[in-house]
Amino acid sequence: MISKESKMVFSKFNLEGKSALITGASGLLGQQHAHALLELGATVILTDISMERLQLAKDKLSQSFRSELVVIKVMDVTKKDDIVSVSEELADQGLRLDILVNNAAIDPKVDKDEGLKESSRLENFTLDQWNLQINVGLTGAFLCSQVFGSRMASDGRGGVIINIASD
């Protein structure tokens, strides 16, 4: 049984009626972020570059939460046109964005089939790998913050931007 004090604390984290967009949402951390936000009552918009992986993530989350609370959108965070398109789609659907979780990243260290990769060592890291890391992790967060942050600020209610960084 939850104590009265605990209920008071948890009520401060009530996200019912709020929407949160998560980039890189089909990965492990993205799904964990989505699960936590759903537990607090938010609707989550999962974005990533693979519809197949997004659908798998939605199916997994829908085992514990109502599927209508999980929206999926294909979006490449390195392409501003993709981000603007998703922003416009959400507006057309009447979904106000309250929270942005910039979570998209490239993880060169582990491959699900091969395990730890030698190419993840700095001395073996190629310039192309470096540029991809920067484009997804930093430029992607910048572009998403610019587009979605502007949208959150435009109605006067604001919002929250959470940047996840591990590189």
Predicted regions mapped to residue ranges:
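Hydrophobic positions on the long internal alpha-helix
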Residues: 86, 101, 144-148
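Canonical Rossmann dinucleotide-binding motif of NAD(H)/NADP(H)-dependent dehydrogenases/reductases
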Residues: 10-45
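The beta1-alpha1 cofactor-binding region of Rossmann-like NAD(H)/NADP(H)-dependent oxidoreductases
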Residues: 51-52, 74-86, 127
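Amphipathic alpha-helical dimer-interface segment in Rossmann-like NAD(P)H-dependent oxidoreductases
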Residues: 92, 132-156
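Catalytic Tyr-X3-Lys loop
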Residues: 118-142, 162
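Conserved glycine-rich Rossmann-like NAD(P)H-binding loop of the short-chain dehydrogenase/reductase
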Residues: 42-56
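Residue(s) in the substrate-gating loop at a strand-loop-helix junction
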Residues: 166
